[in-house]
Amino acid sequence: MLFRSEVDFGFRATHVTTVAGKAIAAAFYGAAPRRAYFTGCSTGGRQGMVEAQRFPYDFDGIVSGAPVVDETGDAVVLLWAVKSLHDANGSALLGSRELNWVHAAVIAQCDMNDGVRDGLIGDPRACTFDPHAMVCPRGADAQCLTERQANAVAAVYAGPRDSKGRSISVAHAFPGSELNWINNYVRDGGLPSIYAGFMTEMFRYLNFSPDPGPSWQIGRAHV
């Protein structure tokens, strides 16, 4: 069963807002708009794609950037990354310091996989970095990871898995993307990351039927 808020998020709100916006513009300017254009990215990109399919006469031109056309798959990938990098109580297992260490180690290993040393990884798919190589003996204070931290990084690289360890998504984070995890997946100072907050609200009020509401927590999620 779909609720009105889910239908609105899925397609209705963009169309109704467009119709209302055109009416407001016509009332204010005394003439209907001659042309209407839409541009959006991510969810906005999906909105543009849906508009083109469901309401093709709403706009004369649509630019859809990075459209999220697989809401379920995208949500699972983001949830997996956030959960992997936090403990059951929601505390981050790594911070920006450790992720900078990991990123530097990845660049050091894989920068030359395209034959050019430029601080960039030419083909992240060819980078087989293992974060467990950064695990140091207990008490070492160099740029080291704990076993649990290395497991967390490896889990994000591997992508969502079921209870038997089988991949359930083609999407995952490549080695070299670690700096993008900062604030998006984990955040310093005990604050929730961007996607921790985003995924919490989506799974509470959008992704299930019926919605579990405020009792749902990322730490209790089972992928």
Protein language model annotation of sequence segments:
Residues 48-49, 71-74:
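Extracytoplasmic/secreted cell-surface and envelope-processing proteins
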Residues 45-56, 62:
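Short glycine-enriched nucleophile-adjacent loop
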Residues 4-12, 20-42, 58:
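Gly/Ser-rich "nucleophile elbow"/oxyanion-hole loop immediately N-terminal to the catalytic nucleophile
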Residues 7-11, 73-220:
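Accessory cap/linker subdomain of secreted extracellular hydrolases
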Residues 1-2, 222:
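Short, small-residue-biased leader/transition segments that mark boundaries at the very start
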Residues 63-72:
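Active-site nucleophile loop of the alpha/beta-hydrolase fold
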